[in-house]
Curated annotation (Swiss-Prot):
Lineage, highest ranks first: Bacteria, Bacillati, Bacillota, Clostridia, Eubacteriales
Enzyme class: oxidoreductase
Subunit structure comment from the entry: Homodimer or homotetramer.
Region Disordered, residue ranges: 1-25
Family label: Belongs to the peroxidase family. Peroxidase/catalase subfamily.
Tryptophyl-tyrosyl-methioninium (Tyr-Met) (with W-95) crosslink residues: 218-244
Species: Desulfitobacterium hafniense (strain Y51)
Cofactor binding summary note: Binds 1 heme b (iron(II)-protoporphyrin IX) group per dimer.
Protein name: Catalase-peroxidase
Cross-link annotation Tryptophyl-tyrosyl-methioninium (Trp-Tyr) (with M-244), location: 95-218
One GO BP: cellular response to hydrogen peroxide
Claim: Plastid is one of the keywords in the record: no
Length: 730
């Protein structure tokens, strides 16, 4: 075939725009700022004024559920339902949509429908879930923009459970779809499916990962690295579910409850299975794993490689899973696909389970290595026995654990939508008290600002405390933020980064102002400490602007309340302790990732853009908000004055920078002519002069005419962080 040539120039046509060698190929360690600009409006097909929450409120949820119930038993020839019921398939789909969540960074989960996109749509653990989503398409098509894919997948899981006799805890809508893969999520560094280079030492799993192998949701059901060691599997199960925010009881309830339904698929060798959806040919239209084993579907389906059902009635909620688990002794065998699994030693069990497609066939139940850990593990075992002997307790535990699994990344209850939102407040929702008092008005705000500035607290102290309170927010799972004032509670009050001794002094002063104001009111008007902390930051920034000769009035909206210690789950907040915060020039110990990468990661969690990250860091440096009041990056002779000095001095070619150690974590900036020490800075500071994109942004704020823009942009970005968790303002 002749090469195509341009009809104008006669030159050979090359790869279309976007192909070829990329910057990342030349410089693989280049700082990735793209994660700060995901899900641009340019890639969103919805109208600019589209409001998903308002559309969902118009949805007839009962009608959608009726259609889902009907779908459960409407078996399609192109993908027949096991036992004539799609319920188990939809449970797995919903579970695997939600099960990517990990507590450490709040990323993953069911909140944005990313199971539709790579890599999740092609993970080995998600084999054949492409069919589940395709079965849902007619319902999604029918209700359109009123229900997102993210909500529909979770709702389908709930309806599947309900259609098989289980009473769920509730359902909340409000998950808005994204339109592209989430590139900010670190799934591991392995270059092949099921790789496990994520471990070191005595099976220490790399943070923030939760799954044991690349492409798995939780654990390898055959056992660690495919080796059928039951007790070792129990260790993996415990660690993985803990990293996904589940305790031991929730873990047992979820596994036992989920495996009450359906079966595994390993009818033949995996060599018959074709490529995953992202690698499948065009004519497959987004489907993958096409099998050449006999019919390739129904009783010939190949999925995980394990074959069989866990209990006699796979489409009915009952105690069959736990009863079967403890009733038999188990022999290790291999499935027709060659996967390790366990079958009862008792020959009488051989015909206790019906076939999924042929009523004339019967089978023995099976268990995976991970299943047996629920019996043999010294902690899981007693819990599983108690659940077996107390069906109502088990049902309640599974209902609550399933609700937590599928709603964990949605944030506070104020984001929940729909008529099936449970009334009970759960501690993992990070509850805050409702506003039960009159809010402060504009005059009160002005008076309180004056008292804050007259309190003896410095600009630096007020700014640092407000930032420490608000910057815990994570856009990933909508946790953290200034609302609740949890900075005064365990564990946040004791975090190293918050400088506990100084923090205690600041909080004592703020609480004094709060008490004085509240006790002087004749009505119900009050100011919360959460509001006062943010207001203190605003007052300090306004003062810093006045120090620079400018007048600013920062926007402030009261309405935050103060959480109690009883409303704060210490364990789940403890994992949110920053190991690094470049905005405060803080780095705890050594890290495998460069400090500048961790800055970008934190900025992404705060939902900041690259310009917002840039202007915020530059402003915080001159406000002297560093951890420990270090002078690293404080490129100004007038600290606590809101100027663009950080950018001006960083880009000054009169300064020569050199690393002061082999680790290249700290640098000195000396006068090129005299050698005199001018500044010290960290990697986080110097990257704004080194990285070409960040330097371009820094140049904007270093220009002679940029002071007003710098002030406006800093205030805008600051206000964004202060209100990041104010879902009531959206």
């Amino acid at each position: 075939m002749e090469e195509k040539k341009c009809p104008v120039t006669g030159h050979t046509q090359h790869t279309p725009t976007g192909g070829g060698t990329k910057n990342k190929d030349w410089w693989p360690n280049q700082l990735n700022l793209n994660i700060l600009h995901q899900n641009s409006a340019l890639g969103n097909p919805m109208d600019p004024d589209f409001n998903y929450a308002e559309e969902f409120k118009k949805l007839d949820l009962a009608a959608v559920k009726k259609d889902l119930y009907a779908l459960m038993t409407d078996s399609q020839d192109w993908w027949p339902a096991d036992y004539g019921h799609y319920g188990p398939l939809f449970i797995r789909m919903a579970w695997h949509s939600a099960g990517t969540y990990r507590l450490n960074d709040g990323r993953g989960g069911a909140g944005d429908g990313t199971q539709r996109f790579a890599p999740l749509n092609s993970w080995p653990d998600n084999v054949n879930l492409d069919k589940a989503r395709r079965l849902l398409w007619p319902i999604k098509q029918k209700y359109g923009k009123k229900i997102s894919w993210a909500d529909l997948m979770v709702l389908a899981g709930n309806c599947a459970l309900e259609s098989m006799g289980f009473k769920t805890f509730g359902f909340a809508g409000g998950r808005e779809d994204v339109w592209e893969p989430q590139e900010d999520i670190y799934w591991g560094s392995e270059g092949e499916w099921l790789g496990d280079q994520r471990y070191s030492g005595d099976r220490d799993l790399e943070n923030p990962l939760a799954a044991v192998q690349m492409g798995l949701i939780y654990v390898n059901p055959e056992g660690p690295n495919g080796q059928p060691s039951v007790l070792a599997s129990g260790r993996d199960v415990r660690d993985t579910f803990k990293r996904m925010a589940m305790n031991d009881e929730e873990t047992v309830a979820l596994v036992a409850g989920g495996h009450t339904f359906g079966k595994c698929h390993g009818a033949g060798p995996a060599s018959h299975v074709g490529p995953e959806p992202e690698a499948a040919p065009l004519e497959e239209q987004g489907l993958g794993w096409k099998s050449t084993f006999r019919s390739g579907k129904g009783g010939d389906t190949i999925g995980s490689g394990i074959e069989g059902a866990w209990k006699p009635n796979p489409t009915t909620w009952d105690m069959g899973y736990l009863e079967t688990l403890f009733k038999y002794d188990w022999d290790l065998v291999k499935s027709p696909a060659g996967a390790w699994q366990w079958v009862p030693t008792d020959p009488a069990a051989a015909d206790t389970v019906q076939d999924a497609h042929d009523p004339a066939k019967r089978h023995a139940p099976m268990m995976t290595t991970a299943d047996l850990s629920l019996r043999m593990d010294p902690i899981f075992g007693p819990i599983a026995k108690r659940f077996r002997d107390n069906p109502e307790e088990f049902a309640d535990a599974f209902a609550r654990a399933w609700f937590k699994l599928t709603h964990r990344d949605m944030g506070p209850r104020s984001r929940y939508l729909g008529p099936e939102v449970p009334e009970e407040e759960l501690i993992w929702q990070d509850p805050v008290p409702p506003v039960d008092h009159e809010l402060i008005d504009e005059q009160d705000i002005a008076d309180l600002k004056a008292k804050l500035l007259a309190s003896g607290l410095s600009v630096s102290q007020l700014v640092s405390t407000a930032w420490a309170s608000a910057s815990t927010f994570r856009g990933s799972d909508k946790r953290g933020g200034a609302n609740g004032a949890r900075i005064r509670l365990a564990p946040q009050k004791d975090w190293e980064i918050n400088q506990p001794a100084q923090l205690a002094e600041v909080l004592a002063a703020l609480e004094g102002i709060q008490t004085e104001f509240n006790s002087s009111q004749s009505g119900t008007k009050k100011v919360s400490l959460a509001d006062l902390i943010v207001l203190g930051g605003a007052a300090a920034i306004e003062q810093a602007a006045r120090n620079a000769g400018h007048t600013l009035v920062l926007p402030f909206t009261p309405g935050r309340t103060d959480a109690t210690q009883e409303q704060t789950e210490i364990y789940s907040f403890a994992v949110m302790e920053p190991k690094a915060d470049g905005f405060r020039n803080y780095l705890k110990g050594k890290s495998s990732a460069p400090a500048e990468e961790m800055l970008v990661d934190r900025a992404q969690l705060l939902t900041l853009t690259a310009p917002e990250m840039t202007v915020l860091l530059g402003g915080l440096r001159v406000l002297n908000a560093n951890y420990g009041q270090s002078k690293h990056g404080v490129f100004t002779q007038r600290p606590e004055t809101l100027t663009n000095d950080f950018f001006v001095n960083l880009l000054d070619m009169g300064t020569e920078w050199k690393a002061v150690s082999e680790e290249k974590a700290l640098y000195e900036g000396r006068d090129r002519a005299t050698g005199e020490l001018k500044w010290t800075g960290t990697r986080v500071d110097l990257v704004f002069g080194s990285n070409s994109q960040l330097r371009a942004l820094a140049e904007v704020y270093a220009c002679s005419d940029s002071q007003d823009k710098f002030l406006q942009d800093f205030v805008s970005a600051w206000n964004k962080v202060m209100n990041a968790d104010r879902f009531d303002l959206a």
